Structure formats: C-alpha cells, structure tokens
C-alpha cells in the first residue's frame, strides 16, 4: 500500500542526485575540501534559460567529477544537464528576477533560491565560508548533511524504531486475544493505531537522511524495510476493521496518511476520525467495539481483500465469522471449500495458540 513521505517525493528524487557514491557528490566534496565555492544550475535544455544565463563560455562536454571540480575554480556558475551527463556552460553569470523574495543573505545563495523559484529547476550552492552544500528546487531548500552526522542520526532512529516495532507487535498480539474473546474497547484500538502512526512517522522523518546517504545507506535501507514491512498494510486493515461506519481501502489509506503527517494525534482525534463521538479520553475504555475481520482474513487466513469484503458483508463481524461453519462460509461469493477451511482453521489455530501462550 505505502504512505507518502513527510518530505515531498519530488524533493527526495533531487536529493538522490547528490547522495554519496554519485559523481556529482564526489565533485561537490572535492570543491568543499579545496575550500572553493560553487553555484550549479541543472537544466533540461539550456536554450530555454538564455534569459537568466549571461557571459561565460559554452562547453557542451561530457560530465565528470574532475571537470566540474576544475571549472569550480573560476568565479562564475556552472550549468549542467538534469541527468548529470553534460556540462553545458562554465563561468556564467546567473541573473534571476531580483523581485523574487528570498530569505538568504549571501549573494550565491540568494541567486540560487531565486533561480530555483523562477525556473522550477535544481540549483546547488556550495558555501566557501561554511563548507555547506545547499540544494534549491522550486520553493524547497535542503541543506546537505555530513555523512558522519547522517549515519549517527539514522542509527539512533533505527534503534528507536526497533523499540516502537516491539511495542506495536505486543499491542497487536494483545488486540488479537481481545478480538477472539470479543471484548475489545476503543481504547485498545486507539492505543495500537497510535503506536503504529508514531512508528511510520519516524520512518518518514529519517527517509531523506537515508536517501542522502546513498551507497552508505544500504544497510540502513535493509533494516528499515525489515522493521516496517507490512506496518502500513496492518494499520489500513485496522482502520477498516474498527471505523464506526464501513470504509473502503482507499479511504482508510487517506486516514492513515493524515495521521502520519500530524504531530502526535490525541486519542480523542483518532477516535473521532474513526467515527466515534467521544468527549474525553477516559470514555474510550467504556466503548466496546467489534472487529469486522479484515485484518485476520488477510493476514492470518490469507484471503484476498476483494473476497474479504464479501465475507464481512455477509457476517458483519469477526465474532460472527469465527462462529460460522465451513458450510456457512462456502455460501460467500468467492469462498470455496479450500478458503472456507483456511478461515475456519486459521481462527481455531489462533485461538489455540493464544490460549496456550
């Protein structure tokens, strides 16, 4: 299913251009190490931007990190192709519209911000004084971090994620027991959802750092995938299970996305979005709710969601599904002998396992 990043995907794609392991990043690091500055403009077609490119000289040569480094010794800006395969111009003067607002102070960075806003293209500024790489794209600005800082930040975040994932799994396991006993409260559901939202929010906050790490972030990407595998799917199914009114998968995904972008949503706000009219958090323990059964059908019995809709439409709740015989289940469209037994046996097996734990 997947969720949107807190950092826009279009910006993440541009951050990838300057991640460690790329030729462009190698050149930028060399420029910083030599205590140079640089202003680099990435374009699709240089002829489109002749009104903002003045002076300098036309090269139209293949890109290499070494060439870019040598050209940065000159005072003017450098114009590259967007795919970083060509160097079009060197030592040019970039002249964006001076009326475009900018929050920057240095000349190089003011030019970069205005040009990115005016053209919607990537402009990279390297500060000679502060040894910082800044990427401007449209109205966005992203300051590139040092690799050591990124590794430290990502390592800490993954350690935190491991704890959150353990807690989330524990809450899910407890919820399963309550579901099978038909004594789930709204508080149980909200607590589980909140922990899942927090987990995915941390993931989206560190994702740009992992992208920025490039080749250095391969291990972190693997750990992140392992820690978050199916979490968003589980949360969507929980929302579908416990919304007061029936909701489609797409609606549940939108609800999930909304909560991930919020800062620490309250139990009350989660309850209300699920459709429950509660005024105080203490009320959540008094509201009994029943799962529809989507999560169990998909994750335990391995029933496709399209067929799961039919099962829920007939039996309404997980409690009723668990009481249905194989023959009853076979009356559902899309459920034959094999799937009926899969549902019945998976519920029985789960009950037995939870009882013996």
Swiss-Prot record:
Cofactor binding description: Crystallized with Mn(2+) to trap in the pre-reaction state.
Keywords assigned by UniProt, alphabetized: ATP-binding, DNA damage, DNA repair, DNA-binding, Magnesium, Nucleotide-binding, Nucleotidyltransferase, Transferase
Record bears the keyword Transmembrane: no
Activity control: Inhibited by 3'-dATP.
Binding, 3',3'-c-di-AMP: 76, 94, 107, 111, 128
Domain DAC: 8-148
InterPro entries tied to this protein: DisA (IPR050338), DisA_sf (IPR038331), DNA_integrity_DisA_N_sf (IPR036888), DNA_integrity_scan_DisA_link (IPR018906), DNA_integrity_scan_DisA_N (IPR003390), DNA_integrity_scanning_protein (IPR023763), HhH_motif (IPR000445), RuvA_2-like (IPR010994)
Outcome of mutating residue 75 to N: Significant loss of c-di-AMP formation, still forms octamers
CC cofactor: Mg(2+)
One Gene Ontology biological process: DNA repair
Keyword Membrane (UniProt): no
Reactions this protein catalyses: 2 ATP = 3',3'-c-di-AMP + 2 diphosphate
Enzyme Commission no: 2.7.7.85
GO molecular function, one term: ATP binding
Function of the protein: Participates in a DNA-damage check-point. DisA forms globular foci that rapidly scan along the chromosomes searching for lesions. Has diadenylate cyclase activity, catalyzing the condensation of 2 ATP molecules into cyclic di-AMP (c-di-AMP). c-di-AMP likely acts as a signaling molecule that may couple DNA integrity with a cellular process. This rate-limiting step is the accessibility of the active site; mutating the possible exit tunnel (residues 128-130) increases product 2-fold despite Arg-130 being important for ATP-binding. Does not convert GTP to c-di-GMP.
Domain note: Consists of three domains: an N-terminal globular domain with diadenylate-cyclase (DAC) activity, a central helical domain and a C-terminal DNA-binding domain.
Subunit (UniProt): Homooctamer.
Family as reported in the entry's similarity comment: Belongs to the DisA family.
Full protein name: DNA integrity scanning protein DisA
Organism: Thermotoga maritima (strain ATCC 43589 / DSM 3109 / JCM 10099 / NBRC 100826 / MSB8)
């Amino acid at each position: 299913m997947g969720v949107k990043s807190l950092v826009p995907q279009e910006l993440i794609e541009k951050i990838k251009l300057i991640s460690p392991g790329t030729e462009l990043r190698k050149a930028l690091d060399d420029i910083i190490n030599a205590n140079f500055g640089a202003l680099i403009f990435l374009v699709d077609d240089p002829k489109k931007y002749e009104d903002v490119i003045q002076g300098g000289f036309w090269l139209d040569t293949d890109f290499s990190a070494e060439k870019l480094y040598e050209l940065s010794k000159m005072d003017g800006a450098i114009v590259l192709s967007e795919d970083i395969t060509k160097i079009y111009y060197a030592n040019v003067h970039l002249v964006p519209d001076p009326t475009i607002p900018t929050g920057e102070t240095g000349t190089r960075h003011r030019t970069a911000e205005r040009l990115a806003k005016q053209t919607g293209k990537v402009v990279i500024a390297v500060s000679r004084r502060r040894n910082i790489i800044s990427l401007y794209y449209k109205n966005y600005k992203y300051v590139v971090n040092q690799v050591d800082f990124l590794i430290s930040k990502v390592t800490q975040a993954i350690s935190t994620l491991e704890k959150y994932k353990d807690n989330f799994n524990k809450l899910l396991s407890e919820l399963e027991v309550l579901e099978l006993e038909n004594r789930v409260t709204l508080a149980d559901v909200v607590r589980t959802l909140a922990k899942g939202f927090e987990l995915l929010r941390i993931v989206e906050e560190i994702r740009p750092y992992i992208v920025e790490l490039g080749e250095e972030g391969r291990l972190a990407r693997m750990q992140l995938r392992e820690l978050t595998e199916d979490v968003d799917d589980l949360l969507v199914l929980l929302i579908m299970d416990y919304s007061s009114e029936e909701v489609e998968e797409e609606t549940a995904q939108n609800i999930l996305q909304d909560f991930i972008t919020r800062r620490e949503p309250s139990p009350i706000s989660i309850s209300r979005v699920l459709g429950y009219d509660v005024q105080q958090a203490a009320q959540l323990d008094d509201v009994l709710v029943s799962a529809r059964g989507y999560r169990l059908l998909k994750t335990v019995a391995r029933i496709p969601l399209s067929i799961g809709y039919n099962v829920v439409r007939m039996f309404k709740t997980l409690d009723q599904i668990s009481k249905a015989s194989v023959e009853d289940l076979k009356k559902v469209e899309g459920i034959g002998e094999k799937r009926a037994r899969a549902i019945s046996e998976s519920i029985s097996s789960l009950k037995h396992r939870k009882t013996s734990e």
